Amino acid sequence: MGDFAAKLQLYFSYPFVWYALIVGLLIALCSSLLGVTLVLKRFSYIGDGLSHVAFGAMAVAGLVGLTNDMYIVLPITVISAVLLLRTGQNAKINGDAAIAMISVGALAVGYMLMNVFPSSANITGDVCTTLFGSTSILTLKETDVIVCIIMSVVVIAAFLIFYHKIFAVTFDENFMKAAGVKANIYNLIIAIITALIIVLAMNLVGSLLISALIIFPALSAMRLFKSFKSVVICSACVSVFCAGVGIFTSIMAGTPVGSTIVVTDILVFFIFCILSLFTRRSSQ
């Protein structure tokens, strides 16, 4: 026990561990807030689609030699979120088809660019890190943490400011339109916030596992709670808890950060499913 405590104290003496915890917890909180809305609107896979777009944008940033890929990844992901929303409203192309079309195309272009114009000799390692976030969160700099904090504050503030409108759009968009409210504007806000979350989460779990941060906490909360507010609060608590446990386990056990967080989310989801069975039986 003494060796474990000494090892733990040693790890937390390194700044990169604190950076990883701060960024991880903020990203988990942001992704859980909007995850409930995306799941209820049956648009949860927009996270998967935008993450593939972000992967392609990172490849473009590497191609032009930018040291900070945020200048390319963020605007491209936001524009793609808007395009996904507009294309999904097209009668000829439904939402699922639009997501598949844009995400698969971006993923293919990104992987091709990384192979044709490699930024380093270890192409496989670069792709693995981008897709699964295996090491990037443990190599964060102080400037990365500051950017993450600023973007997280923007996301949380936007969610709180437009909370009631987001709630209305989630449950009865047609009524909002009939009442004269421009629901498309709030759908656009949801898409932009989602794009910001995707860009933030790239360093944590990689582009292939981002949807897990959005979906699992929301689904876990829905096992036990029914009201929108309760589900959002529970989802945020679950997401932050899983991120903290996942990062801590990853550092201590040497496992990949992203996959460890997702596995923790999956385990918590099954625990909530079991608890929901007991609560149903007790209520009967």
Put a short name on every predicted segment:
Residues 21-25, 70-75, 97-101, 145-150, ...:
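Hydrophobic alpha-helical transmembrane segments
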Residues 255-262, 266-284:
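Cytosolic-side transmembrane-helix boundaries in multi-pass membrane proteins
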Residues 16-28, 67-78, 149, 199-212, ...:
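Structural signature of hydrophobic alpha-helical transmembrane segments
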Residues 36-51, 55-121, 221-233, 250-254, ...:
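Short loop segments and helix-boundary regions at transmembrane helix junctions
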Residues 1-29, 283-284:
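Membrane-interfacial amphipathic/re-entrant helices at transmembrane-helix boundaries
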Residues 140-217:
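Helix-loop-helix "hairpin" substructures at the membrane interface of multi-pass membrane proteins
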Residues 203-259:
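Transmembrane alpha-helical segments in multi-pass inner-membrane proteins
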Residues 7-10, 103-160:
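Transmembrane helix-bundle core of multi-pass membrane transporters
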